[in-house]
Curated annotation (Swiss-Prot):
The gene is pmpE. Residues 1-18 form the signal peptide. It is found in: Secreted, Cell wall; Cell outer membrane. Keywords: Cell outer membrane, Cell wall, Membrane, Secreted, Signal, Transmembrane, Transmembrane beta strand. This is Probable outer membrane protein PmpE.
């Protein structure tokens, strides 16, 4: 027997920065281990009378099994009177399936007036309740009691606790006739500290004239999911009210896995319309809902209700401090496409740690018998409907986070206040955007948030972009920035008529024009508009409105509220570029002449230049009669357009974008090639011809200090080599090597991982009968590199890139061997050399955050002239050995520092970097030891490097040679 289970696949997690829409949820089948190997015939693993259990402790059993049990009383398999505990059931788990009762508790139940508690905890194996039913399909009168309701398709108890279980817990395809398709408790249902996933799927309860609440769960007092370590799934559950959960109080707090409410639904009453309303496609609560402190992703997707709240119906909602949260494609027939709030206490929705996104949530407005809506009230997008008469709605976002509404919200009562980013630490963005509205639905009803409620912005950003419209009666900005992007509309309107009317009022302090959004191809400039008053579809300009721009600071920003000069292409000059439109009832009604433009030309990174500004004014002719104006767009006669002119003057990248890391890769290549050229094979002339093979390992460490305002780096290399040697009077060697390198930028996590493949040839000439030794060395190296950049200052973003490099080098050394005092064991040799390196890298483009492209403008060229002395000591025992010590001064004769052209793709700004150069003067050293244990076997060890005011380099090489 295999029980059907599932997992879900979700697209890439959002960081909370981008205006993105997440992927949909995909469900796929997966199998769960059998709870038991026993037969699936009519069977129960418990012996004795299971229908009158009092203080029953079922501890440490191998398994618990109840299949195809039937009873005319409460609890088809188990009936309890006081307390029932399933504790420490072993790995075959707990399995209740296909049990049936015409009363309450399809598997486990109780009879009044008892009030028992059920506890399932510390189970090792899976806990499965499947296909249990409490349903009375015919009228049946118990002669000893009144007709009873039928609730709890799987479990009916006063209190239920499911805690500390180790394997999956699943309630699937359970059915009740009244409430709690899977679980019904008169008081409390608690799920806490479970280690594996928790599943409610395909549970259902249908409506009677008594109730019809909770497709999966009904709790009479409270329901909580706390501190669970894995995922919580609510899939395909159905009921009249609360498609998955119905409870006065519901909380999901401190859970570490993902939380998914998918395709739950509230259908229409089947018996009477006077019963519980069909609200809350996923959750309906009558007091409050708390979703706080959860670390995984939260999805409310494709939930449906016949009435209010496509996903959630609640008097009070607290949705704060969670992982990425998405409300996608939820549907309500009347109001509240995703969330419906109708209480008078404060509700709070805040994207504190990750983004919260509302997208494609719909109010269908179906009224016709054929399931369609009227043309006067067609379907529309709606994220949240607030029907409260008083209270406060708090909407906010933490630092660098976004609360994004791709669907409008509705606050219908002026007694409710709406506060954006009220708390001081809420410095993120609350975004109204029409970016996901397709052309077929591009209508004001899907773009406009219109409310008589007073709105206040205290901190952070209130963003209106991509043709979204915010129409208010009263709006006050005490802090933060009102960001206006492509096609944004911020307007005010007079609410009501006569003496009870509330005049329009908007007070702003700081407007940020989203430069990258306004300048993109096909974009429209934002609009500030005093809406005319409407009297029987005749429109009159509202001269009484107060919409003040006096002393308002105007600045230019990007999508994230930052300086736009590194995210916008300002390569070319802009002449009289329209940036903001104003439509007003009287000349200078908005006092736009007094806007503070001092924020335009401030010091910044990115494109440098100068902004100048001016206004283009137009005035429509006065109509013959105001009664003839039937188009609200034509009621205002006075219009202004802000024109900005930009004169570019170069580009200065910010430190986080400069990235000396790529140029430092060439410096690393140069250092590795330099030490490889100095890594002599210690060839010596021989009295007879010979040839041989060599092989060995190498390691290198470099510490480069910061130089010229560039951070230094640490480099570690290791690898191996193999080659051949041959010769007599003159010798020749050829060596191939592969090295693995990790270059880390100092004081940062940025790094480059490399593989270098090298070929090196060496020739030694003995001239003037050994008086002069001349060595020629050549090298070619090819490198594969992977770079990683980390943006850690409040962003936690990364970028990656792959590129190649080529390095060529050559060296010549002249030695003058001398034997002081006629000794045959001691040799000294002054030497002079010249060593040149050329290195360049390929063009490449990063992927990830702030992508850039890099290419070599000028390659790195470095020429050294080492001059020094070496000394050798040799013995001629049966195991000949030679020790060599070398000390040299190596100045740079010529250097062309690398010029790496970097371009930030968002702004198309280009700059050049040379990395962190090493000092031009250094002292090098070398110690080597060579042993010949056999006539045909030579062991060779070398340690060398150099030290300068900027760089400390160490190179270690061990090699074995077989001569024939």
């Amino acid at each position: 027997m295999k029980k059907a289970f599932f997992f879900f696949l979700i697209g890439n997690s959002l960081s909370g920065l981008a205006r993105e829409v997440p992927s949909r949820i995909f469900l796929m089948p997966n199998s769960v281990p059998d709870p038991t190997k026993e037969s699936l015939s009519n069977k129960i693993s418990l012996t004795g009378d299971t229908h009158n259990l009092t203080n029953c402790y079922l501890d440490n059993l191998r398994y618990i099994l109840a299949i195809l049990q039937k009873t005319p009383n409460e609890g088809a398999a188990v009936t309890i009177t006081d307390y029932l505990s399933f504790f420490d059931t072993q790995k075959e788990g707990i399995y209740f399936a296909k049990n049936l009762t015409p009363e309450s508790g399809g598997a486990i139940g109780y009879a009044s007036p008892n009030s028992p508690t059920v506890e399932i905890r510390d189970t090792i194996g899976p806990v499965i309740f499947e296909n249990n039913t409490c349903c009375r399909l015919f009228t049946w009168r118990n002669p000893y009691a009144a007709d009873k309701i039928r609730e709890g398709g799987a479990i009916h108890a006063q209190n239920l606790y499911i805690n500390h279980n180790h394997d999956v817990v699943g309630f699937m395809k359970n059915f009740s006739y009244v409430q709690g398709g899977a679980i019904s408790t008169a008081n409390t249902f608690v799920v806490s500290e479970n280690q594996s996933c928790f599943l409610f799927m395909d549970n259902i309860c249908i409506q009677t004239n008594t109730a019809g609440k909770g497709g999966a769960i009904y709790a009479g007092t409270s329901n909580s999911f706390e501190s669970n370590n894995c995922d919580l799934f609510f899939i395909n559950n159905a009921c009249c009210a609360g498609g998955a959960i119905f409870s006065p109080i519901c909380s999901l707090t401190g859970n570490r896995g993902n939380i998914v409410f998918y395709n739950n639904r509230c259908f229409k009453n089947v018996e009477t319309a006077s019963s519980e309303a069909s609200d809350g496609g996923a959750i309906k609560v009558t007091t409050r809902l708390d979703v706080t402190g959860n670390r995984g992703r939260i999805f409310f997707s494709d939930n449906i209700t016949k009435n209010y709240g496509g996903a959630i119906y609640a008097p009070v909602v607290t949705l704060v401090d969670n992982g990425p949260t998405y409300f996608i494609n939820n549907i309500a027939n009347n109001k509240g496409g995703a969330i419906y709030i109708d209480g008078t206490s404060n509700s709070k929705i805040s994207a504190d740690r990750h983004a919260i996104i509302f997208n494609e949530n719909i109010v269908t407005n179906v009224t016709n018998a054929n399931g369609t809506s009227t043309s006067a009230n067609p379907p529309r997008r709606n994220a949240i409907t607030v029907a409260s008469s008083s209270g406060e709605i708090l909407l906010g976002a933490g630092s660098s986070q976004n609360l994004i509404f791709y669907d409008p919200i509705e606050v219908s009562n002026a007694g409710v206040s709406v506060s954006f980013n009220k708390e001081a630490d809420q410095t993120g963005s609350v975004v109204f955007s029409g970016a996901t509205v397709n052309s077929a639905d591009f209508h004001q009803r899907n773009l406009q948030t219109k409310t008589p409620a007073p709105l206040t912005l205290s901190n952070g950003f209130l963003c209106i972009e991509d043709h979204a419209q915010l129409t208010v009666n009263r709006f006050t900005q005490t802090g933060g920035v009102v960001s206006l992007g492509n096609g944004a509309v911020l307007s005010c309107y007079k609410n009501g008529t006569g003496d009870s009317a509330s005049n329009a009022s908007i007070t702003l302090k700081h407007i940020g024009l989203n430069l990258s959004s306004i300048l993109k191809s096909g974009a429209e400039i934002p609009l500030l508009w005093v809406e005319p008053t409407n009297n029987s579809n005749n429109y009159t300009a509202d001269t009484a409105a107060t919409f003040s721009l006096s002393d308002v600071k105007l600045s230019l920003i990007d999508d994230y509220g930052n300086s736009p000069y590194e995210s916008t292409d300002l390569t070319h000059a802009l002449s009289s570029q329209p940036m903001l439109s104003i439509s007003e009832a009287s000349d200078n009604q908005l006092q736009s002449e007094n806007i503070d433009f001092s924020g335009l030309n401030v010091p910044h990174y990115g494109w440098q230049g100068l902004w100048t500004w001016g206004w283009a004014k137009t005035q429509d002719p006065e109509p013959a009669s105001s009664a003839t104006i039937t188009d609200p767009q034509k009621a205002n006669r006075f219009h202004r357009t802000l024109l900005l002119t930009w004169l570019p003057a170069g580009y200065v990248p910010s430190p986080k974008h400069r990235s000396p890391l790529i140029a430092n890769t060439l410096w690393g290549n140069m250092l590795l090639a330099t030490e490889s050229l100095k890594n002599s094979a210690e060839l010596t002339p021989s009295g007879h011809p010979f040839w041989g093979i060599t092989g060995g390992g190498l390691g290198m460490m470099v510490y480069q200090d910061p130089r010229e305002n560039h951070p230094g780096f640490h480099m570690r290399s290791s690898g191996y080599s193999a080659g051949m040697i041959a010769g007599q009077t003159h010798t020749f060697s050829l060596k191939f090597s592969q090295t693995y390198t990790k270059l880390n930028e100092r004081y940062a996590k940025n790094n480059v991982s490399s593989k270098n493949y090298s070929c090196q040839g060496e020739m030694l000439f003995s001239l003037q009968e050994g008086f002069l030794l001349t060595k020629l060395v050549g090298l070619y190296s090819y490198g594969d590199h992977n770079c990683h950049h980390f943006y850690t200052q409040g962003e936690n973003l990364t970028s990656q890139g792959t590129f190649r490099s080529q390095t060529m080098g050559g060296a010549v050394f002249f030695d003058l061997p001398m034997k002081p005092f006629g000794s045959t064991h001691i040799l000294t040799a002054p030497f002079l050399g010249a060593l040149g390196i050329y290195s360049s890298l390929s063009h490449f483009t990063e992927v990830g955050a702030y992508p850039r492209s890099f290419s070599t403008k000028t390659p790195l060229i470095n020429v050294l002239v080492p001059i020094g002395v070496k000394g050798s000591f040799m013995n001629a025992t049966h195991r000949p050995q030679a020790w060599t010590v070398e000390l040299a001064y190596q100045p740079v004769l010529y250097r062309q520092e690398p010029g790496i052209a970097a371009q930030l793709l968002a702004s198309k700004g280009i700059w050049f970097g040379s990395g962190s150069p090493s000092s031009r003067h250094a002292m090098s050293y070398k110690i080597s030891q060579q042993t010949q244990p056999l006539s045909w076997l030579t062991l060779h060890f070398q340690y060398h490097g150099f030290y300068s005011s900027s760089t400390f380099c160490n190179y270690l090489n061990g090699e074995i040679a077989l001569r024939f």
